[in-house]
From Swiss-Prot:
Origin species: Trypanosoma cruzi (strain CL Brener)
Protein name, per record: Proline racemase B
Superkingdom, natural source: Eukaryota
Residues forming the catalytic site: C91, C261
Signal peptide: none
């Protein structure tokens, strides 16, 4: 048996959503920032993503990330996110997993008697400032982790999208929380958020994302490479009394987020804040389709003079952005050495999804 390549990974989940983090075995990936590394992987080495994410090593709802040395000043780790359909500029649940793994596996050293360990991630969407909160009396056991996300904002409000029957005309908000989201109430689609309705939610989410990218142009005003709606966030009434809403996010190749979605939580908080429905410092609890929870807060707001998006009323006053924090719990499930045999007919993975 002769192996073409081997990769080492940490297999984790954050509030139920998979996070397979590749820690070593990659060749040199060119790029002067994480966005360029992401683009290089996509254009030249996408077989790696497929082999790691898809069957038989992964599954149709797999998620993961590549770790790199950081490039941006002040960062501890570089990271590029991936799923079964491609790559994302940012991911909240996988950032929480990476922060947790960095501390619990010794990737980063932990100061003596520390209770909170800062971990700064260099992502394609910008710097994400994480904190691993340690269990009392331990040196590296993480009770949960928080991330301060990249600036988030409501981009466009009450966008009318026409879908095939039985959905018809649907109104959505478009917001950015590290990725662009189309945010839609479940009642507008006529579907309750439940595991039993998952296939219908996936179908509606994929239809909506396809149509919104066909009919609506989005462009991050400061990051030229971010110009598509990557995720559809369907929300409704919470089941858990602690939560404000329940949601499911559809992304990738009809993937459904098992966690409450970190970047989606930021996008939702930015939307609520812009509408006057959430205050700075107020706790916002978001529930997933599984019933797991993220805790979020808006930490502050800022106006960027001269920069505008469709909801900006006064270009001189500028675009409103908010700083958001998300907290959740990630678990290490195992350490994985992946072997790639050149004679394997499924070397680079496969999917049975159409």
């Amino acid at each position: 048996m002769r192996f073409k390549k081997s990769l080492t990974c940490i297999d984790m989940h954050t509030e139920g959503e998979a996070a397979r983090i590749v820690t070593s075995g990659l060749p040199h990936i060119p790029g002067s920032n994480m966005a360029e590394k992401k683009a290089y992987l996509q254009e030249n080495m996408d077989y790696l993503r497929r082999g790691i994410m898809l069957e038989p090593r992964g599954h149709d709802d797999m998620f993961g990330a590549f770790l790199f040395d950081p490039i941006e000043e002040g960062a501890d780790l570089g990271i590029v996110f991936m799923d079964t359909g491609g790559y994302l500029n940012m991911c909240g649940h996988n950032s929480i997993a990476a922060v947790t793994a960095a501390v619990e596996t010794g990737i980063l050293s932990v100061p003596a008697k520390a209770t909170n360990v800062p971990v700064v991630l260099d992502t394609p969407a910008g710097l994400v400032r994480g904190t691993a909160h340690l269990q009392s009396g331990t040196e590296s056991e993480v009770s949960n982790a928080s991330i301060i996300n990249v600036p988030s904002f409501l981009y466009q409000q009450d966008v009318v999208i026409v879908l095939p029957k039985p959905y018809g005309e649907v109104r959505v908000d478009i917001a950015f929380g590290g990725n662009f989201f189309a945010i839609v109430p479940a009642e507008h689609l006529g579907i309750d958020i439940s595991v039993q309705n998952l296939s219908r939610l996936q179908e509606a989410g994929e239809l909506l994302r396809t149509e919104i990218n066909r009919s609506v142009k989005v462009q991050h005003p400061q990051l030229p490479h971010i110009n598509t709606v990557d995720c559809v966030e369907i929300y409704g009434n919470a089941t858990n009394p602690e939560a404000k809403y329940k949601n499911v996010v559809i992304f990738g190749n009809r993937q459904a987020d098992r966690s409450p979605c970190g970047t989606g939580t930021s996008a939702k908080m930015a939307t609520l804040y812009a509408k006057g429905q959430l205050r700075i410092g107020e706790t916002f609890v978001y529930e997933s389709i599984l019933g797991s929870l993220f805790q979020g807060r808006v930490l502050g707001e800022e106006r960027i003079p001269g920069v505008k998006v469709p909801v900006t009323k006064d270009a001189e006053e500028g675009m409103l952005v908010v700083t958001t924090e998300i907290t959740g719990k990630a678990f290490i499930m195992g350490f994985n050495t992946m072997l790639f045999d050149p004679t394997d007919p499924f070397l680079n993975g496969f999917t049975l999804k159409r």
